[in-house]
């Protein structure tokens, strides 16, 4: 498997240890991958999912990195990569009847978003 290295016109941002299931975050990232920054923000604002808050925060950070570090215009940016990887689970216990305890796993994930300058081809 080959991995693509970020190019000179790509800026990245990572959100680590975000509370939420990786599958629930991925269903939102699948919707915004490949879209422009403006379209993605509008979509995230009106989606009814709890994970849109942290995703919006990471997306804004990636765009700020592109503006500050690379001098790119936010209007010309597209979301080139958007991934969610599994983080560690926090283990908690729920007391149950007759002295039993049920395990509860509170899942976390790592969100990575890369934005690139839009090419006119």
UniProtKB/Swiss-Prot annotation:
The gene is rplV. This protein binds specifically to 23S rRNA; its binding is stimulated by other ribosomal proteins, e.g. L4, L17, and L20. It is important during the early stages of 50S assembly. It makes multiple contacts with different domains of the 23S rRNA in the assembled 50S subunit and ribosome. CDD domains: Ribosomal_L22. One of its GO terms (cellular component) is cytosolic large ribosomal subunit. One of its GO terms (biological process) is translation. It comes from the Bacteria. It comes from Synechococcus sp. (strain CC9311). PANTHER family: CHLOROPLAST 50S RIBOSOMAL PROTEIN L22-RELATED, LARGE RIBOSOMAL SUBUNIT PROTEIN UL22M. This is Large ribosomal subunit protein uL22.
């Amino acid at each position: 498997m080959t991995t693509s290295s970020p190019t000179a016109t790509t800026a990245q941002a990572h959100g680590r240890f975000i509370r939420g299931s990786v599958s629930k975050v991925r269903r939102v990232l699948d919707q915004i991958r490949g879209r422009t920054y403006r379209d993605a923000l509008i979509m995230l604002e009106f989606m009814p999912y709890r994970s849109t808050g942290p995703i919006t925060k990471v997306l804004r950070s990636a765009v700020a990195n592109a503006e500050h570090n690379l001098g790119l215009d936010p209007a010309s940016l597209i979301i080139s990569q958007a991934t969610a990887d599994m983080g560690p689970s926090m283990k908690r216990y729920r007391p149950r009847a007759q002295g039993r305890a049920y395990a509860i796993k509170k899942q976390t994930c790592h969100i990575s978003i890369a934005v690139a300058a839009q090419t006119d081809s």
